[in-house]
Amino acid sequence: MFIGLRLRIQVDEDNLQSITQQLLSHLAGPDSVAAVPTAVHSLSQHAQSPHGVQTSSGLAGIRAYRLTLAQRILSICSRDTYTNVTDFEWYLSVLVDLAYVASVNVGLQIRDQLVDIVGRVKAARRYAVKLMVKLLNDDTFLLNASDEGSCAEVLWAAAWICGEYCGWDPSSL
């Protein structure tokens, strides 16, 4: 079972990435569905620092590390057709947040999961449309869409979801 454990270890920069990779391997599969949000939150926190900003972990600016974090979040939650996800509105929010903070090329995976979830989970469609409308109306996201690692591919998913399910929330379109 995943147990939230905070350790403070003093290490040099050479060992930090190795230790972090070992910790990530333990998060590969939380033992209970209830532990998934905690694990995803923990991974998301590490991915949230902006490009080039040194963080307490020292690794958020390393592209390979950020890619590993993003892929781990996507893998944990999508495993066995989303059996680890009990709240799809929460996971849709996680996917959109990840599109904003990843700064690595995971846009295709996020796009595919957004479309897949909305197609499978009728109860999440209204929320998805609202979320996608916000994304499409975000000028900053749109202006940065040409940047490497911008996850601009999610804009396709947002447009498709809004078009396909526009009747779910016509007031926001």
Residue ranges and their predicted role:
Residues 1-173:
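Extended alpha-solenoid helical-repeat scaffolds
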